[in-house]
């Protein structure tokens, strides 16, 4: 019985075996697509899960839409440093979202913001050429929010599985 449980896990791991024909730039772009997909899908899942637990779904969806607007305005301003992002979003949520929803909204966004902080620290902090990638991660968070509040579809922006062909996850 245990062996049967391992089959799907092994299939998932080995289906991502590397495509050795990729140039380093192509491999890096593909890995970055994986990061964007994971962040967007994670935020979407988190928000859909939270919205499913509350009574006033429309009100909560409105709060999350406000947060997506906050993130988009932050991206437009060009200030993408994690400390600025965290403070701007926390202040904006506390201003626009009443208690106790503000804490829940921040909690639902924690996955995406943690991923952003880790990505920034690893890839942008010492290499400002990657700042545009940081902007794309923030946009993926906003897209995940918008997908999460959509009561009908919730489809994400990525149409193909970016995990195909990878085993090396370092940019």
Please report, for each region that a protein language model flagged, where it lies by residue.
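Cationic, hydrophobic amphipathic alpha-helical membrane-interacting segments
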Residues: 17-171
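Sec-dependent bacterial lipoprotein signal peptides
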Residues: 1-16
């Amino acid at each position: 019985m245990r062996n049967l449980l391992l089959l799907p896990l092994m299939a998932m791991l080995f289906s991502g075996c590397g495509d050795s024909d990729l140039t380093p730039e192509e491999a890096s772009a593909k890995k970055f697509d994986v990061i964007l997909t994971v962040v967007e899908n994670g935020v979407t899942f988190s928000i859909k899960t939270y919205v499913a637990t509350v009574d006033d779904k429309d009100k909560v969806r409105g709060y999350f839409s406000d947060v997506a607007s906050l993130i988009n305005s932050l991206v437009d301003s060009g200030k993408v440093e994690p400390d600025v992002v965290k403070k701007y979003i926390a202040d904006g949520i506390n201003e626009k979202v009443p208690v106790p929803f503000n804490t829940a909204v921040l909690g639902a966004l924690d996955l995406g913001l943690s991923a952003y902080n880790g990505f920034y620290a690893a890839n942008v902090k010492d290499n400002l050429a990657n700042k545009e990638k940081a902007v794309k991660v923030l946009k993926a968070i906003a897209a995940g929010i918008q997908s999460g509040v959509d009561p009908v579809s919730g489809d994400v922006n990525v149409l193909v599985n970016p995990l195909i062909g990878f085993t090396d996850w370092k940019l």
